[in-house]
Amino acid sequence: MRKKVVSAILCASMVAGMVVIPGVAVKADDKKLIGVTMPTKDLQRWNQDGENMKKELEAAGYEVDLQYAEDDVQMQVSQIENMIASGVNCLVIASIDSSALVNVEEQAKNAGIPIIAYDRLLMDTDAVSYYATFDNKGVGTAIGNYIKEAKDLDAAKAAGESYTIEFFMGSPDDNNALFLYNGLMEVLQPYLDDGTLVCKSGRTSFEDTCILRWSQETAQQNCENYLTGFYADEKLDICASAFDGFAYGCKAALEGAGYKVGEDWPLITGQDAELMAVKNIISGY
């Protein structure tokens, strides 16, 4: 994805009137400034994305103003306003709230500054020149297929068996989250319908399972509430989590409820392949 993003930035540079040939570095006396704003430094993936983007752009001859907004929408607005005022030639925005930047995006458009929406689509605006992302629905489908195969849901259905499941989906202000949910449910909904999968909390809609700002703490609290309210006499078999941070929250809740690896530990999914998540997988979580 990193190379695709750099290519998109190079294309946007041409839109802004820069004479740039992809793969050819910008002359030292003609450097252009790219403003990059990421949602937060609290998550490994955003740190990596920001630093990798900065490295690739600087290697291509650009100057880069990289900032992190600490999951504060107003801070991100201020960062973008300052970047516009400083005369950036292009903006790369990984938004906190996909619909909260309309006014500042209009400022950039009026200033002739192209915008690249990175990972998360910017909504309710025509100021976006490019959108660099991945197949979010495909990620959800992959998670669903992993659950289907790991638990052999078709065999369970044929045998009249069932598994319990609870859902931990992404932020409602992130357009990607709904795509992922739809991909996941495209695989799992038939098994919910025929009783092979049982969600004892009854919370299966996106509205009921989405977690604002991808909060690990909220995921942990939700999981604790599910375990206390619905699983006192039965074990939870699957935590369908859309994000590694949610998986950490579920892990903490499950450990607090006495679940043990190798005994009754449920299947937990995630996304981003953070180092801690990979270590958890190796350890059997």
Q: Which role fits each region the language model picked out?
A:
Residues I9-V19:
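Hydrophobic core
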Residues R2-V5, V26-Y285:
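A residue-level marker of the well-folded mature domains of exported/periplasmic proteins
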Residues V15, A25-V26:
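Cleavable N-terminal signal peptides
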